[in-house]
Amino acid sequence: MINKVKNAIIVRMKLLYNCLGGGNNVQGISLLRRLSNFTILGIGNMIEVKSKIPKDVNIVIYGNNHKLVVEENVTFKRGIIWFEDHNCEIRIGSGTTIESANLAVAEGGTQLIIGKDCMISSNVHISTTDSHSIIDIDTGIRTNPSQNVVIGNHVWLGNSTSINKGVVIGNNAVVAGHSVVTKPVAPNSIVAGIPARTVKNNITWDRNRI
């Protein structure tokens, strides 16, 4: 009965166009009131939102026991937050700003963690999976398993960057626009290119023109 009541409240406030399943826990309903495209198909999912999420951000959750955390003072203007399979997590740290991004955890048990005070530009893609399988012909074993993505604190991702599965980006790093990151990025460094390579070390950055 409790689960049915929760779902009814959410639908009545026009937060969810589709909420099927039970035991889904949404915290921060008042911050989601302008959201126009929200789907949960599963059970036991947790959403904890401490910042306003606008109508141009779509949240899609397929599967069970996923967790989405959006901390305080986050600005997310446009994009998609996408979950598939089960037991995945996306976390966006406090003070982070996102112009537009596609954040995807599409294989079971993976995490996509974005630290505090990050600056994410437009058309950024971050994913823990390739979504499809690449298989070794001789062994029949898949060669591209999913991996976590961890972005540290105070990281700047330029326009149209792609952060691939398994990447860890250190604090204060900068990823130049249109780069494709496939390997770890050291703290206080700039990477650029396809695939991204280190072009400068011993740096930090500031949102202001100083």
Model-predicted regions and their roles:
Residues 100, 177-178:
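Conserved beta-strand->loop/alpha-helix structural units within folded catalytic cores of enzymes
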Residues 159, 176-177:
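Short, hydrophobic/aromatic alpha-helical segments in well-folded domains
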Residues 187, 192-195:
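Acidic, glycine-centered active-site loop in nucleotide-sugar glycosyltransferases
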